[in-house]
Amino acid sequence: VYRKAEQKAIIKYVDQNTGETLENDQVSGKSGEAIDYSTAAKIKYYEDRGYVLVSDEFPAGATYDTDASVDQTWTVTLKHGETPVGPNDPHNPTDPINPNDPNSPTYPATDQWKKDVTSTVKYVVSDGKATAPADNVQNAQWTRTLTLDKVTGKVLSSTPWAANKANYDAVPTPGLTGYYADKGSVASKTVTQENLEETVTYNPLGNLVPKPETPNDPNFPSTPEVKYPNDPTDPSK
């Protein structure tokens, strides 16, 4: 009586990036019988963890062969998927890269691809007897796009940092009655990846005090001190 030989088949799942075998599925049956196996569920499992299918050697309708000395082997090859994060693809650092994977790596901190910077002009009154104008603050932003490995979460590459503008505007110094500023304006500055700051100081204007040619001249009229007026066109004068 002819008896069908017991056969074994192995389906290997291989990480193309590392060359490592992710796992081996082993099935067994009789020679000539259909192999009751599908790679679909396992491929979906790895796709949920950031992999992309490269090739699947396991054929539809596969049967066990008649050679018991050699195991039938098929390879399913997968590679690491990639995904961007940046101004056009923003994500929170707590967001999973692979939402269907409970152990998914998360996106990197936002400051890895976005930096907000400022240029601030501070106004100070040297004698503290007047209220200085409010600080002038201008904003700029640097961004870049990172490409991430979906399996590991590591950064694979990045575009150069780019600012949303090249320069901060020049800032005319506001006038302050009774005071002159040490700068008539603050010049335009190039946007850098650091915060910039400059201070404008207001000092009190001098007083005009009339004096008689002869001390204690009783005929010299009593005149109070006269403040020098501000230059209406230049707060530094």
Model-based region annotation:
Residues 17-19, 23, 27, 52, ...:
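Elongated, non-catalytic scaffold/linker segments and compositionally distinctive motifs
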Residues 20, 51, 76, 146, ...:
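Intrinsic-disorder/low-complexity peptide segments enriched for small residues
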Residues 37-69, 158-189:
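Surface-exposed interfaces of beta-sheet-rich extracellular modules
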Residues 38, 196, 233-236:
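Long, non-catalytic architectural segments outside compact domain cores
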